[in-house]
Amino acid sequence: MSELSTVARPYAKAAFDFALEQGQLDKWQEMLQFSALVAENEQVVEYITSSLASGQISEIFLQICDDQLDQYGQNFIRVMAENKRLAILPEVFNRFNALRAEYEAIKKVIVVSATELSQAQEEKIAKAMEKRLGQKVRLTTEIDSTLLTGIIIKYDDIVIDGSSRGQLNRLTQALSL
């Protein structure tokens, strides 16, 4: 996976820099998201990994995308097709999002809970994490029915386990020493 990230990085950086310069971060994010979804389609994967000429591949891809891409987005796709890199569009989209989050100083935080959190709970967690991290956060919530109570918070490589399962595991480890 790191190889994909390495190959995708310059494309994502070029798209991000251009979008930032043009003041079109939202538009480019949408275009890349759509292109990434197209590139993940099984039938499209057959075309982009086939032995067709890159010009043919890019034209097929652009026909599928239709009016979802502006002229610059189309040129971006043509360059990627010419370099036989359309298959990495999902990773380019992920890297673009990471660059945007870094630029906007937004930290992605995942909150795992046993049940769906209320809006007030999400806001309270977001405020606490913003205070702890010193930057804005974007919460993504997940539900794990194996948790009895509590939450697990993940960001970067850090996991804060406030679940009852985690507390029981820590207690078991402490007692076994």
Swiss-Prot record:
Database matches in Pfam families: OSCP
Primary location recorded for the protein, binned into one broad class: membrane
Key word Cell membrane present: yes
Alphabetized GO MF terms: proton-transporting ATP synthase activity, rotational mechanism
Its membrane topology: Peripheral membrane protein
InterPro entries registered for this protein in UniProt: ATP_synth_OSCP/delta_N_sf, ATPase_OSCP/dsu
Entry's family note: Belongs to the ATPase delta chain family.
Function comment: F(1)F(0) ATP synthase produces ATP from ADP in the presence of a proton or sodium gradient. F-type ATPases consist of two structural domains, F(1) containing the extramembraneous catalytic core and F(0) containing the membrane proton channel, linked together by a central stalk and a peripheral stalk. During catalysis, ATP synthesis in the catalytic domain of F(1) is coupled via a rotary mechanism of the central stalk subunits to proton translocation. This protein is part of the stalk that links CF(0) to CF(1). It either transmits conformational changes from CF(0) to CF(1) or is implicated in proton conduction.
Subunit structure: F-type ATPases have 2 components, F(1) - the catalytic core - and F(0) - the membrane proton channel. F(1) has five subunits: alpha(3), beta(3), gamma(1), delta(1), epsilon(1). F(0) has three main subunits: a(1), b(2) and c(10-14). The alpha and beta chains form an alternating ring which encloses part of the gamma chain. F(1) is attached to F(0) by a central stalk formed by the gamma and epsilon chains, while a peripheral stalk is formed by the delta and b chains.
Name the record gives this protein: ATP synthase subunit delta
Organism from which the protein derives: Haemophilus ducreyi (strain 35000HP / ATCC 700724)
Gene this chain is encoded by: atpH
